[in-house]
Amino acid sequence: FQSFAQKKSKGISFSLQVGSENETEKPKLVVGIVVDQMRYDYIYRFWDDFGNDGFKKLINEGHFFRNCQFGYVPTYTGPGHASIYTGTTPAVHGIIANDWYDKQSGDYIYCAGDGDMHTVCNCEQKNVDVQSADGKMSPHNMLTTTFADELKLFNSESKVIGISLKDRGAILPAGHAANAAYWMNSEGRWITSSFYMDNLPTYVQEINDNNTAQNYLIGTWEVDGEFSHNLESMFSQKGGAAIKNTPFGNSILTDLSLKILKNEKLGQRENTDVLTISFSSTDYIGHQFGPHAPEIKDTYLRLDKEISEILEELSKRVGQENVIVFLTADHGVVSEPNELLERKIPAGYFDG
């Protein structure tokens, strides 16, 4: 599988398959987890504070790849996710950045954009949202197949579903032949595109109605003596989308993944299924506060518990011996200039 990587080159990755005596036996479920903007050094920096059933379980009971490299630039979210799941580089799969200028057409291209599609949702402002860009998405800009596409070609009965707060984090990993991809719109609700379906499944509609982003944005996000952020104030300013800039964006995504496992019965049939999960809040928080901020550490300690919850649910519903899980990152992030300057490393800002 692909690797964790900074926006330099090196990184790590790990995967888990435990309990199967016959390694050629096909898994019932493959779960791909991408942690957006995760640097390889986070594993070492936060190791002592991680629990035993999240990151540590994957590392201690699985395979831990420490020395990997990206063979391309830029290492953004779009090309990162596409490269992980296609197994090739942007020059081949076509997702060369998050967005780019096409000289032949004279258009600016968004990596997951598709003007021929429309939003599918049960949104508060449905008529407006259907016409918005939130759901005008598909993987049509990706020129190659993902491993999930190859699985669907082999067995069309396999289910493939991708989820993320970001549209590109859900769409590109799931591939062209996916059954579904879900991401969060500007209201903080789960939506999809007409590329996949005409109506949201009932259980996704129920999540939007009963498990809204506002339910998570109560009180404060704080660590004593380190920071305190008023979640209700954030909601009043930005609405449900404010959850993306908090660790509770990872929580609501985890809750969606558990609902999908239950309602879609992934891994509980004869066919091999695929679930791709991309945690995006780590990227939003990383950009807002920087990789050395206390908010980052707290976010990853909370994410460790989310991963533990997912692994526990997989073990209960599918059986650990029937699941392959891999976890990696689409890219990392450079250190803040002020952090480097404190260590007497030349750094600074410039206007480009």
Locate predicted features.
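Beta-strand elements within well-structured catalytic alpha/beta cores of enzymes
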Residues: 27-39, 58, 84, 151, ...
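His/Asp/Glu-rich, glycine-adjacent segments
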Residues: 89, 94-271, 280-287
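Active-site-proximal N-terminal segment of extracellular/periplasmic enzymes that hydrolyze or transfer
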Residues: 7-63
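Second-shell loop/turn segments in exported
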Residues: 21, 39-46, 70-71, 132-138, ...
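Short, structured active-site-proximal loop/turn typified by the sulfatase FGly-forming signature C/S-X-P-X-R
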Residues: 43-92, 157-163
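A long, amphipathic alpha-helix that forms part
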Residues: 16, 42, 243-269, 282-323
